[in-house]
Amino acid sequence: MSTRVVVGLSGGVDSAVAAYLLKQQGYDVLGVFMKNWDDDDNTEHCTARQDFLDVLAVADVLGIEVEAVNFAAEYKERVFSYFLAEYQAGRTPNPDVLCNAEIKFKAFLDDAIARGADYIATGHYVGKGHDTFGRAALLRARDANKDQSYFLYRLNQAQLSPALFPLARLPKPEVREIARRIGLPNAAKKDSTGICFIGERNFREFLERYLPRDPGDMTTPEGRVVGQHQGLMYYTLGQRQGLGIGGQKGGSDAPWFVAAKDMATNTLVVVQGHDHPLLQRFGVGAGQLSWIAGVAPDPERPYTAKTRYRQTDAACHITTLYDDTLELVFDAPQWAVTPGQSVVLYDGDVCLGGGIIC
């Protein structure tokens, strides 16, 4: 009997090509489409119906079976409730990180095992290897521009070990070329950019449906009122667009940036200039730690880390590491480090894990 791989098919080109490559390698491939959002499932806000039609069309070309599963209840309980609580607390969460750990590599993994899977696979741009102790290791993808290891840092050994990542060494243009060459109907489909499983939508309107809007003052660090915000949940550190602050009489023409949120007074603190000192930090603290190997990294060794997805790695060293507390100091100041986002550590091309920025 051939080895069975259950592939998470999203309707996009990456997971479709991943399924094709696995079939070419001789695996028994079953496609599974995950539907994880039920609210306002209409053509304006959600493309789930079209995505499923794309999955069916891909499965037809590849000659594989496909099934649909609904994890909407799990998504709301494990991901969306956290998402709302973080925004309500003034932080800026990254739902994709939790979505991967709780849905794509937990709910989906459990479902796949129940279907007799030996492995699961996704279209993520990451690699997998093993360390000197034989533990599964998460590696950067060959295509540095598409590498998604930042979003998978919360996986544990039980989740990573049965996972296959066929796109690990492929650049995105080559993935699209493969899709065109074999006649996949979604070869030119654009990449999704919305909130994990919720899709692309007006963010403020979406949040306002679940959290009450609470306008307040925008002030300088000295306390001078320069405008009004629409609700602290709508803003993130380092944000420049959408502040609605014009030039101040007798003041600088430098652009304004969000520097802090004062939850106690419902005040948004803004500063002028990209390089303002309040936007720079050498030290970063984190909690809710998760280490892929199951053990914490050696605090005596140097590492690199990133505090946001598109950021270039920066050299750092660990100053505090115990229980669920991590403190790092970077060699150079980091810009707009944002509570609620993740700081992720790397040892070369190996993603070690990380935590939620305090």
From Swiss-Prot:
Q: Which Pfam families match?
A: tRNA_Me_trans, tRNA_Me_trans_C, tRNA_Me_trans_M
- What are the alphabetically sorted keywords of the record? ATP-binding, Cytoplasm, Disulfide bond, Nucleotide-binding, RNA-binding, Transferase, tRNA processing, tRNA-binding
Documented EC number(s): 2.8.1.13
Where it sits in the cell: the answer is: Cytoplasm
Catalytic residues of the enzyme: C99, C196
Q: List the disulfide bonds.
A: C99-C196
**Which HAMAP family does the record match to this protein?**
tRNA_thiouridyl_MnmA
The entry's family comment says: Belongs to the MnmA/TRMU family.
Instruction: Tell me what this protein is called.
Output: tRNA-specific 2-thiouridylase MnmA
Instruction: Tell me the organism's taxonomic lineage.
Output: Bacteria, Pseudomonadati, Pseudomonadota, Betaproteobacteria, Nitrosomonadales
